[in-house]
Amino acid sequence: MTIQRMDHVSVVVDDLEAAIAFFVELGMEREGAAQIEGPWVDRINGLDGVRVDITMLRTPDGHGRLELTKFHHPTAVSAEPKNALGNTLGLRSIMFAVDDVDATIAGLRAHGADLVGEVA
């Protein structure tokens, strides 16, 4: 058995519309959205009474997908520390190739993003 492809990465967000706007600004395209709940969702999340809204986005080349998830029940919990260091266990980063770094940064700043350091 071998992996055929990576299907998607899932990110839990507090403000679904703001997250969608951020990634659409990067050039991702909406693929679909749904509210999901039921026993199978409880089972895969290890929680009871799960009700979430999800939006699936895809990269312009169609090879990468990102699932943005907003928990309505139970409410999402914050990971600590909020500004974790680079060596903290867990998801570290998602990286994208862009045509124009300066234009991309300017567009993302309109959505509240800021640089954490110089662009190399």
Language-model features: where?
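Basic/polar N-terminal segments that are highly enriched at the extreme N-terminus
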Residues: 1-2
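Vicinal oxygen chelate
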Residues: 5-14, 53-72, 79-108
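Core segments of cupin and vicinal oxygen chelate
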Residues: 12-63, 103, 110
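Short hydrophobic/aromatic-rich motifs at helix boundaries and adjacent loops
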Residues: 26-28, 75-78
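Conserved S-adenosyl-L-methionine
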Residues: 31-34, 116-120
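Histidine- and/or cysteine-centered catalytic micro-motif in compact active-site loops
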Residues: 35-36, 71-73
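A cross-kingdom feature marking solvent-exposed beta-strand/loop segments within repeated
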Residues: 38-42, 76-81, 118-120
